[in-house]
UniProtKB/Swiss-Prot annotation:
It is found in: Secreted. Keywords: Acetylcholine receptor inhibiting toxin, Amidation, Disulfide bond, Ion channel impairing toxin, Neurotoxin, Postsynaptic neurotoxin, Secreted, Toxin. Negative results: does not affect alpha-3/beta-2 (CHRNA3/CHRNB2) and alpha-3/beta-4 (CHRNA3/CHRNB4) nAChRs at 1 uM concentrations. GO terms for cellular component: extracellular region. Belongs to the three-finger toxin family. Long-chain subfamily. Type II alpha-neurotoxin sub-subfamily. Binds with high affinity to muscular (IC(50)=114 nM) and neuronal (alpha-7/CHRNA7) (IC(50)=58 nM) nicotinic acetylcholine receptor (nAChR) and inhibits acetylcholine from binding to the receptor, thereby impairing neuromuscular and neuronal transmission. Competitive radioligand binding assays also demonstrate that this toxin competes with epibatidine binding to the Lymnaea stagnalis acetylcholine-binding protein (Ls-AChBP) (IC(50)=4.9 nM). This is Alpha-elapitoxin-Dpp2d. Monomer (predominant). Expressed by the venom gland. It holds the Pfam family Toxin_cobra-type. GO terms for molecular function: acetylcholine receptor inhibitor activity; ion channel regulator activity; toxin activity. The modification Arginine amide is found at residue 72.
Length: 72
């Protein structure tokens, strides 16, 4: 499996056993100025959701793209 690890659509081959791509977003102290923090990566299972954190998981190559800004 390959998953996006950066915002420039650069994908990375996931380690063996990690077949899930994820996009994790959350707010920190600068959320109102900079927007949500974002983490892209691979996992063996979809990470557990914690309060204030959004996680989207998918299982096809490079399916975890993240688009900044609002659609026009």
């Amino acid at each position: 499996r390959t998953c996006n690890k950066t915002f420039s659509d650069q994908s990375k081959i996931c380690p063996p056993g990690e077949n899930i791509c994820y996009t994790k977003t959350w707010c920190d102290a600068f959320c109102s100025q900079r927007g949500k923090r974002v983490e892209l990566g691979c996992a063996a299972t979809c990470p557990k959701v914690k309060a204030g954190v959004e996680i989207k998981c998918c299982s096809t190559d490079n399916c975890n793209k993240f688009q900044f800004g609002k659609p026009r």
